[in-house]
Amino acid sequence: MSTRNCQGMDSVIKPLDTIPEDKKVRVQRTQSTFDPFEKPTNQVKRVHSENNACINFKTSSTGKESPKVRRHSSPSSPTSPKFGKADSYEKLEKLGEGSYATVYKGKSKVNGKLVALKVIRLQEEEGTPFTAIREASLLKGLKHANIVLLHDIIHTKETLTLVFEYVHTDLCQYMDKHPGGLHPDNVKLFLFQLLRGLSYIHQRYILHRDLKPQNLLISDTGELKLADFGLARAKSVPSHTYSNEVVTLWYRPPDVLLGSTEYSTCLDMWGVGCIFVEMIQGVAAFPGMKDIQDQLERIFLVLGTPNEDTWPGVHSLPHFKPERFTLYSSKNLRQAWNKLSYVNHAEDLASKLLQCSPKNRLSAQAALSHEYFSDLPPRLWELTDMSSIFTVPNVRLQPEAGESMRAFGKNNSYGKSLSNSKH
């Protein structure tokens, strides 16, 4: 059985040893006079997607990623910390450390609330890591119940500190604590929240690009929050091309594995499908153990080896060589992950997310309207962006148990177990 590593705190993917040296991700640190916190002056033309289509993102042929962080202060309120002051917070304990940042549990000295302090180390000759600039500039404008809240930005000579709301665990740790698959009601609520957050950022032309259980925070009330936007990309931020080494291997879509750099919001939707299956089945959907070739073989074993009929354009992708891959026929997903058959409409939704051809993947907005969610309270679709789903009566997490999926059975519905709650 494959195991997860829930300890990673990096915004940048730690390259696998099997990835060639020339393909590994490098952290770019640059300086210029550009202010990433200023609202872009150019207007982004709204993209109208047809049917369930994802939104395509075009890259710039001339733009360069070279901003420099300036100290930024936001208006404070009587219950908020004084923004921009390092002495407003107390470090309590280290939560994790990555290649360029250390994350601490902290506390506001002004209001006593717990926070997460992401302390990014700066080197004068190298400037500020662009991943940190990207994360701060994007999160500053995102206000949604299912996206981690950025409270404050503190810039000193030695460090850049991003102050986030404190959320006590993540989905990776949650699944490790409850092995064997999560309670199906909880899977549904987690997935609904994930899609809410993604729909919000996708409508604002932002890709997350690093969806994995470690980057989905879970509060003690069951709120799921998208976090770690270090690899996120906004259409208004110019770049030459997107790196094809941006998503942890297990959650990386086949088009990216095959070298495509023509990204759309469909990139994130593959990760949603992988996480959905993992929550239900209790194991990663495609736990590659060797390299990109092995990862693709695991995908094709279930979904079938693609060709021009099933995936138009696949032969033009840089790394697609038909002779490299075993010829597999596609299967019903329940043959690979039997617990999908225990929950009404789960297999159908998973099959529409896990499409090799990115153009065939369901968008986040369309997925929210899938029949899988039909037994949820209608008020969930009427919530404002900042409203938690748990403000709706009778919406709450259920107790987890190792055998929850077996006890649940095939014929139970979401509403039958709402009355029994651990909260």
Curated annotation (Swiss-Prot):
Active-site residues, record numbering mapped to chain: 210
Annotated protein name in UniProt: Cyclin-dependent kinase 14
A Pfam family annotated for this UniProt entry: Pkinase
Catalytic reactions of this protein: L-seryl-[protein] + ATP = O-phospho-L-seryl-[protein] + ADP + H(+); L-threonyl-[protein] + ATP = O-phospho-L-threonyl-[protein] + ADP + H(+)
Sequence ranges assigned to domain Protein kinase in this UniProt record: 89-373
Molecular function in Gene Ontology: ATP binding; cyclin binding; cyclin-dependent protein serine/threonine kinase activity; protein serine kinase activity
Swiss-Prot/TrEMBL keywords: ATP-binding, Cell cycle, Cell division, Cell membrane, Cytoplasm, Kinase, Membrane, Nucleotide-binding, Nucleus, Phosphoprotein, Serine/threonine-protein kinase, Transferase, Wnt signaling pathway
Enzyme class label: transferase
Function field: Serine/threonine-protein kinase involved in the control of the eukaryotic cell cycle, whose activity is controlled by an associated cyclin. Acts as a cell-cycle regulator of Wnt signaling pathway during G2/M phase by mediating the phosphorylation of LRP6 at 'Ser-1490', leading to the activation of the Wnt signaling pathway. Acts as a regulator of cell cycle progression and cell proliferation via its interaction with CCDN3. Phosphorylates RB1 in vitro, however the relevance of such result remains to be confirmed in vivo.
Activity control note: Serine/threonine-protein kinase activity is promoted by associated cyclins CCDN3 and CCNY and repressed by CDKN1A.
Stored InterPro entries: CDK, Kinase-like_dom_sf, Prot_kinase_dom, Protein_kinase_ATP_BS, Ser/Thr_kinase_AS
Sequence positions that bind ATP: 95-103, 118
Record's GO cellular component terms: cytoplasmic cyclin-dependent protein kinase holoenzyme complex; cytosol; nucleus; plasma membrane
Region of interest: Disordered: 49-87, 403-423
Family (UniProt): Belongs to the protein kinase superfamily. CMGC Ser/Thr protein kinase family. CDC2/CDKX subfamily.
Location of this chain's protein in the cell: Cell membrane; Cytoplasm; Nucleus
CDD domains according to UniProt: STKc_PFTAIRE1
Annotated membrane topology: Peripheral membrane protein
Biased segments, Polar residues type: 49-64, 410-423
Assembly and interaction partners: Found in a complex with LRP6, CCNY and CAPRIN2 during G2/M stage; CAPRIN2 functions as a scaffold for the complex by binding to CCNY via its N terminus and to CDK14 via its C terminus. Interacts with CCNY; CCNY mediates its recruitment to the plasma membrane and promotes phosphorylation of LRP6. Interacts with CCDN3 and CDKN1A. Interacts with SEPT8. Interacts with 14-3-3 proteina YWHAB, YWHAE, YWHAH and YWHAQ.
GO biological process: cell division; G2/M transition of mitotic cell cycle; regulation of canonical Wnt signaling pathway; Wnt signaling pathway
E.C. no: 2.7.11.22
